[in-house]
């Protein structure tokens, strides 16, 4: 990717972030700790330099994230001196919701979708910036940069507004909110090339290292803590792996890889023949799973 293209993508994203700050009364950044969130955080810092972003960062904690993700989150927020809101769906905790016992669909609905809706309502946020990209998944491919949600935080593809020549309709009615995706036009390759250019810190799990995994179905699941139950025929082995995408560890498959640096990751992406979200189990709960989740309020 040329430097000029990265500069255009950066300029577009910063313009969108500033547009949100200028037109909404109480925006927030959804910080999921992944590589896209790291780029979004970096862009938000650039957009308001030498000041700080005029809005908080929200992390919806499912209690099943990789431990390295939580350590990275806390370190970044502390070093940058940013306001972080961590929200957990206490109803889900009280019910003992688990991706192992209840499955990915129930877990995601309770601990991600419902938790996000609770947080947006609790703090009366009227706009939520997030790092989703159109290239990632087909339902995201057809979503606008400024994506209006109704009073129940649901997405209706038929209500999408035209977006032409970087002109955005930011108006919302009472009770409605807006999800905003400044990285909509970025690809996975763009994200990593920008990471290389700007030297953006990311969770170490993106880089290959020997890690404990079990082979489960067609995927490899990393054993991140003692809560993971093993099937009778499963054995934990050390393998050289990394992750292209990060989420709850029981629902995120690893890939075998020797890519320990950003240039090596870039070469691997160019040669890849599968989507980066191919290893995210929540995308395959049912036909049209991601669009259904978005209609229910998922980011």
Curated annotation (Swiss-Prot):
Q: Which Gene3D superfamilies match?
A: HUPs (3.40.50.620)
Which N-terminal stretch is annotated as signal sequence? none
Q: Name one GO biological process term.
A: hydrogen sulfide biosynthetic process
Q: Which domain of life is it from?
A: Bacteria
EC code(s) of this entry: 2.7.7.4
Q: Does the keyword Nucleotide-binding apply?
A: yes
GO MF entry, a single one: ATP binding
Q: Name the SUPFAM superfamilies for this protein.
A: Adenine nucleotide alpha hydrolases-like
- Catalyses which reaction(s): sulfate + ATP + H(+) = adenosine 5'-phosphosulfate + diphosphate
Whether Zinc counts among this entry's keywords is no
Which EC class heads this enzyme's classification?
A: transferase
Q: What is the effect of changing residue 63 to P?
A: In strain: CIAT899
Swiss-Prot/TrEMBL keywords: ATP-binding, Nodulation, Nucleotide-binding, Nucleotidyltransferase, Transferase
Assembly and interaction partners: Sulfate-activating enzymes, NodP and NodQ, may be physically associated.
Q: Which NCBIfam families match?
A: CysD (TIGR02039), PRK05253.1 (NF003587), PRK12563.1 (NF009214)
Query: What is the similarity comment for this entry?
Result: Belongs to the PAPS reductase family. CysD subfamily.
Biological function: Proposed to provide activated sulfate for transfer to nod factor.
Q: What is this protein called?
A: Sulfate adenylyltransferase subunit 2
Q: Which organism is it from?
A: Rhizobium tropici
Gene field: nodP
């Amino acid at each position: 990717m040329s430097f000029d293209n990265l500069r255009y993508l950066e300029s577009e994203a910063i313009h969108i972030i500033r547009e949100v700050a200028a037109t909404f009364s109480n925006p927030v950044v959804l910080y999921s700790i992944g590589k896209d969130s790291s780029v979004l955080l970096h862009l938000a810092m650039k957009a308001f330099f030498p000041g700080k972003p005029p809005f908080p960062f929200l992390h919806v904690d499912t209690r099943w994230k990789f431990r390295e993700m939580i350590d990275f989150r806390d370190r970044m927020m502390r070093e940058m001196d940013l306001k972080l809101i961590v929200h957990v769906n206490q109803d889900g905790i009280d019910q003992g919701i688990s991706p192992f016992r209840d499955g990915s669909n129930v877990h995601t609905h309770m601990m991600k979708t419902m938790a996000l809706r609770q947080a947006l309502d609790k703090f009366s946020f009227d706009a939520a910036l997030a790092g989703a990209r159109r290239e990632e998944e087909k339902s995201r491919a057809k979503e606008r940069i400024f994506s209006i949600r109704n009073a129940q935080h649901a997405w209706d593809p038929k209500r999408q507004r035209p977006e032409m020549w970087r002109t955005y309709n930011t108006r919302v009615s009472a009770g409605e909110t807006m999800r905003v995706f400044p990285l909509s036009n970025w690809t996975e390759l763009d994200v990593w090339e920008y990471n290389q250019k700007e030297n953006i810190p990311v969770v170490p799990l993106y880089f290959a290292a020997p890690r404990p995994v079990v082979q489960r179905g067609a995927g490899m699941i990393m054993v991140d803590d003692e809560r993971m139950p093993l099937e009778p025929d499963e054995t934990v082995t050390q393998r050289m792996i990394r992750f292209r995408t990060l989420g709850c560890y029981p629902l995120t498959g690893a890939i075998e890889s020797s890519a320990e640096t950003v240039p090596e990751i870039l070469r691997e992406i160019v040669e890849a023949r599968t989507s980066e979200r191919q290893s995210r189990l929540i995308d395959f709960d049912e036909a049209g799973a991601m669009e259904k989740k978005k209609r229910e309020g998922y980011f």
